[in-house]
């Protein structure tokens, strides 16, 4: 299948042949959900922790004698039912990350690309580069291409002027091809790929 290549000015600059195994798959929401959940779980810090009964600073002495008081039996004042005691089954410092097979991750990326193309939310440009780092000029380019909320994926290296100009625009993310991921693709309305990015994806999934 062929994709139309556009310039930043919105003009056509030819066509690019792409593989149907990357850009024309049947949508699978279950796979996309698994990959997004895996990404967000890896990102979650997990630094929350409460003090258990072994962590609180209270005496370890028995509260009162075992028998003869008529009261319920108690030992440590650190028990969760007492004021100043430890938290029962509270959160602990841990990693929320879980495993996901590489094949599922790769399939998820191809499904995300296919979903954007089927929704007509995929734009291919010849290159992501500008002469001057002028945000106002770049905004006009984006309006000509028809988007104001997008993820832009360049080649191995991002043009520094383009990156600086785009960094001031809200709802616009710019990443090199190494950083492409399912979550960022789905969270933005449009996906903009440079010609170099498409070629890198073709090489990656060959």
From Swiss-Prot:
Q: Does the keyword Ribonucleoprotein apply?
A: yes
Q: Which keywords appear in this protein's UniProt record, sorted alphabetically?
A: Ribonucleoprotein, Ribosomal protein, RNA-binding, rRNA-binding
What are the Basic residues biased-composition ranges? 64-76
Question: Its GO biological process terms?
Answer: translation
In terms of domain of life, where is this protein from? Bacteria
Give me the stretches of Polar residues compositional bias: 42-54
Keyword Ribonucleoprotein on this protein? Answer: yes
Q: Name one GO molecular function term.
A: rRNA binding
Please give the InterPro entries that the UniProt record associates with this protein.
Ribosomal_uL4, Ribosomal_uL4-like, Ribosomal_uL4_dom_sf
In residue numbers, the region (Disordered) covers 42-94
Q: What would be one Gene Ontology cellular-component term for the protein?
A: ribonucleoprotein complex
Role of this protein: One of the primary rRNA binding proteins, this protein initially binds near the 5'-end of the 23S rRNA. It is important during the early stages of 50S assembly. It makes multiple contacts with different domains of the 23S rRNA in the assembled 50S subunit and ribosome.
What is annotated about its quaternary structure and interactions?
Answer: Part of the 50S ribosomal subunit.
**Similarity comment:** Belongs to the universal ribosomal protein uL4 family.
Its recorded name reads Large ribosomal subunit protein uL4
Record the organism: Bartonella tribocorum (strain CIP 105476 / IBS 506)
């Amino acid at each position: 299948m062929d994709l139309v290549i556009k310039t930043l000015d919105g003009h056509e600059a030819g066509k690019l042949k792409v593989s149907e195994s990357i850009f024309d798959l049947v949508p699978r929401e279950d796979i996309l959900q698994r990959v997004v959940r895996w990404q967000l779980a890896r990102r979650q810090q997990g630094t929350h922790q409460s003090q258990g009964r072994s962590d609180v600073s209270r005496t370890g002495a028995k509260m009162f004698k075992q028998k003869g008081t008529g009261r319920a039996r108690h030992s440590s004042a650190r028990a969760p039912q007492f004021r100043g005691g430890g938290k029962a089954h509270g959160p602990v410092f841990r990693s929320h990350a879980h495993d996901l097979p590489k094949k599922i991750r790769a399939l998820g990326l191809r499904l995300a690309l296919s979903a954007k193309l089927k929704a007509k939310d995929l734009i291919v440009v010849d290159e992501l580069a500008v002469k001057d780092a002028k945000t106002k000029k770049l905004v006009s380019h984006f309006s000509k291409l028809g988007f104001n909320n997008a993820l832009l994926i360049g080649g191995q290296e991002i043009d520094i002027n383009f990156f600086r100009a785009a960094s001031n625009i809200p709802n616009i993310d710019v990443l090199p091809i190494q950083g492409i991921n399912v979550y960022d693709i789905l969270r933005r309305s449009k996906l903009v790929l440079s010609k170099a990015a498409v070629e890198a994806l073709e090489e990656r999934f060959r």
